[in-house]
Swiss-Prot record:
PROSITE patterns (alphabetical): FAD_FR
Gene (name only): OXNAD1
Protein name, entry field: Oxidoreductase NAD-binding domain-containing protein 1
Binding, NAD(+): G175, V176, G177, I178, N179, P180
The EC number(s) this enzyme carries: 1.-.-.-
Length: 309
């Protein structure tokens, strides 16, 4: 994974025990670990190596799997109960994922909101099947009460302060790239609820989700997304795209589905000086839309993107 975040957004808007103890060390020690692993292997860089210079928290917390389910034919959803009370994250960030007996460390975006962690000490992940050892473990061996460790990292997030200027969000997702954007969407909904109930807090603008997948079976978290659209019809909207649909689209999804890729026109229609764009998906997709936005004179500090391999 490679993360590219505009500097102006970084401030706000934007065996387990053995590994955990090592990663509590200094950043230089962390970089030494990743460099050492590269020297020992000629394989292409993994998550730790790609993100060696990305900001991470110091806390490495034990966590227990308290829920596991199939989110789609190719994606497993995990719910983790996090032990360390000092563990926290911002909407959009990811975790280093340490598994006993698995030497490779995973990197998975959190798809739940920070509020869920605050209230119930839980986070959610959604992991696509792959030959990568951590993903294989999740799909083939992970069960209820499996124990892992997690550490938060990443500079791709939305974390406005109550006094920050109101912003609209356009969230552009491809495939499993929905994960950090769902976290941001859920956080935006929590901010809307807080403002409605207390009459104070951050004033959230509108949120538009543009989400593309192969077919409706691979559109992750459809029900959660549509529930938020229905809860906040004046604030949250979505356009769900499918590129290789072969079966009939169900009546409940039809109003939200477009067959074909997300287009430049859809993006341009939502450009304004109050709008921030968050993009997450395969590298060609993130490159295309970030360049399209720049060519449309959207300020670079209003464009945030994250690439997943």
């Amino acid at each position: 994974m490679v993360v590219v975040i505009p500097r102006l957004l970084r401030g706000s808007l934007g065996a387990i025990c053995t590994q955990a103890a090592l990663l509590r060390s200094t950043p230089s020690a962390f970089r030494y670990l990743t460099r050492s692993s590269v020297m020992k292997s000629k394989r292409r860089p993994d998550h730790l190596e790609r993100t060696a210079d990305v900001v991470r928290q110091e806390v490495v917390s034990a966590a227990k799997v308290c829920g596991v389910a199939s989110e789609s034919p190719s994606v497993k959803r995990l719910c983790l109960l996090v032990a360390d009370k000092d563990f926290s994250f911002k909407a959009g960030q990811w975790v280093d994922f340490f598994i006993p007996g698995v030497s490779v460390v995973g990197g998975f975006s959190i798809c739940s909101s920070p509020r869920l962690l605050e209230q119930e000490r839980m986070i959610e992940l959604a992991v696509k099947h792959a030959n990568h050892p951590p993903a294989l473990w999740i799909h083939n061996q992970c069960t209820l009460d499996s124990e892992v460790a997690v550490r938060v990292g990443g500079e791709f997030f939305f974390d406005p302060k109550p006094t920050d200027a109101s912003r609209n969000l356009v969230l552009i997702a491809g495939g499993v790239g929905i994960n950090p954007l769902l976290s941001i969407l859920r956080h935006a909904a929590d901010l809307l609820r807080e403002r409605a109930s207390k009459g104070q807090g951050y004033e959230m603008g509108t949120v538009r989700l543009l989400y593309s997948a192969k077919d409706t079976s691979e559109l992750l978290f459809k029900k959660n997304i549509l529930d938020l659209v229905n809860e906040f019809p004046e604030k949250i909207a979505c356009s769900l795209h499918v590129t290789k649909q072969t079966t009939q689209i169900t009546a409940d999804l039809r109003p939200y589905i477009t067959e074909g890729r997300i287009t430049q026109k859809e993006i341009r229609d939502h450009i304004s000086k109050e709008t921030l764009f968050y993009i997450c998906g395969p590298p060609p997709m993130t490159d295309f839309f970030s360049k399209e936005l720049e060519s449309s004179r959207v300020p670079r500090e209003h464009i945030c993107f994250e690439k997943w391999w």
